[in-house]
Amino acid sequence: MTKNKGSQRGEIMKVALIASDNNASSGAFLSMTNLAIQLNQLHVKTIVIIPKEGPYVGPGDGVNLLRKHKIKYYVVPSISGVVSCDFPRNILATLGQIKYILRNKIYARGLAGILKKEHVDLVHINTVYSYFGAYAARKVNIPYVWHIREFLEEDQGNEFYFPKYMYKLMNRADLVIAISRSIYKKYNKSLHKNVMKVIYNGIDIDQFYKPERQIFEDSILKLCYVG
């Protein structure tokens, strides 16, 4: 991986986290927010880039989490490269998706300006739904890491419209992080093994460990299984 500019300047490193949604109940958004919190505690500065609107963006309440934890953020428009598996495959649809790629390249120019202004050393792309961060990182010669959290077809009924193009961008990343062995096994068929690594989501023990709470004391145990 390219040596970060912050360490070369003898300054604190700064990471830009590229979100694909703005949803306080989204697992991916929560994981990214927790990552920002942990990085800040380690004296690594962070900024978050959230999309303006779109089919996968959500209700727009993710910013409340960022404000609560005093995480600096920017709203930058972007368009996902992911579509539903039943999305039409015809000339008009393909032309529309090509138009979105061109628009994302324009949006990436604005993001590149933010990366330069903020003196960002590393770009972290939070899901496979967003890819314009890769354009911006390459434009200003900043290394980027890509987090894969989704199977897509198997768990969400979605897919890349241009899979080969998306895998090409992902293969150019300095690191691709799979959150499980199963995710790794799916994507390593299309991505270079030397850029992929399995890193499980961290758990804040203090958030879940409640020794003072008494459970399983009643004679009848009632369980609710959801999913």
Predicted regions and their residues:
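Conserved donor-binding/catalytic core segment of Leloir-type glycosyltransferases
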Residues: 15-18, 216-227
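N-terminal strand-loop element at the rim of the active site
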Residues: 19-25, 38-98, 183
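Nucleotide-sugar donor phosphate/pyrophosphate-binding loop at the beta->alpha transition
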Residues: 106-107, 132, 143, 150-172, ...
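Glycine-rich phosphate-binding loop signature in dinucleotide/nucleotide-binding domains
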Residues: 114-120
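Carbohydrate-associated surface elements
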Residues: 182, 202
